[in-house]
Amino acid sequence: MELYLDTANVAEVERLARIFPIAGVTTNPSIVAASKESIWDVLPRLQNAIGEEGTLFAQTMSRDAKGMVEEAKRLNNAIPGIVVKIPVTAEGLAAIKQLKKEGIVTLGTAVYSASQGLLAALAGAKYVAPYVNRVDAQGGDGIRMVQELQTLLERHAPDSMVLAASFKTPRQALDCLLAGCQAITLPLDVAQQMLNTPAVESAIEKFEQDWKNAFGNLNL
């Protein structure tokens, strides 16, 4: 199972990498724009934060296949081993096919249906990123879509994997894992929600109070 953080906040990546067993960091144009840093400045800093073994993801901006391929090559030259995110449009599928031939690893992003995700996988994307909460927000069932996509990949594109994205709650992320997803990416607020459990803090405080009442200190 691979756990990623969905952010371009280098300081938060450094902080949470000490706590979470993260496999890397995913970004998108909106996330990079929010950082107020050039993508060519922030990507090396993110790679440094996750270490050489961590996997970094960045997205192209072009709308046509030729431009996507050119941008993917620029990203790969800047950060060797980066996974290039390609929106799963008609042009995006053509770009994914070409990049597969050239040995550049891709992720099919902006996936709103299982059929769309399957096409990305068949085109050669190693990862496929369904947008769970965004599907829910449009009146669909994000978790069910992930379940369908997971089944399709297992049967017809076993070399690809679901990297579920777009979460608002830890429950959504857990449901994706229960559906068989091998990878998820968490925005910072959802990652923090997993850590901030009031009941846990209350239990620890009770342990400390009982110990202090018995022994007068909090030392072993």
Swiss-Prot record:
PROSITE patterns xrefs: TRANSALDOLASE_1, TRANSALDOLASE_2
Catalytic activity: beta-D-fructose 6-phosphate = dihydroxyacetone + D-glyceraldehyde 3-phosphate
One cellular-component annotation, GO: cytoplasm
A GO molecular-function annotation: fructose 6-phosphate aldolase activity
Documented EC number(s): 4.1.2.-
Keyword Nucleus carried by entry: no
One GO process term, biological-process aspect: fructose metabolic process
Transmembrane region(s): none
Top-level taxon in the UniProt lineage: Bacteria
Record's keyword terms, sorted: Carbohydrate metabolism, Cytoplasm, Lyase, Schiff base
Compartment(s) of residence: Cytoplasm
Family that this chain belongs to: Belongs to the transaldolase family. Type 3A subfamily.
PANTHER family (UniProt xref): FRUCTOSE-6-PHOSPHATE ALDOLASE 1-RELATED, TRANSALDOLASE
Stated role: Catalyzes the reversible formation of fructose 6-phosphate from dihydroxyacetone and D-glyceraldehyde 3-phosphate via an aldolization reaction.
Record NCBIfam families: fsa_talC_mipB, PRK12653.1
Identification of the protein by name: Fructose-6-phosphate aldolase
Species of provenance: Salmonella arizonae (strain ATCC BAA-731 / CDC346-86 / RSK2980)
Taxonomy of the source species: Bacteria, Pseudomonadati, Pseudomonadota, Gammaproteobacteria, Enterobacterales
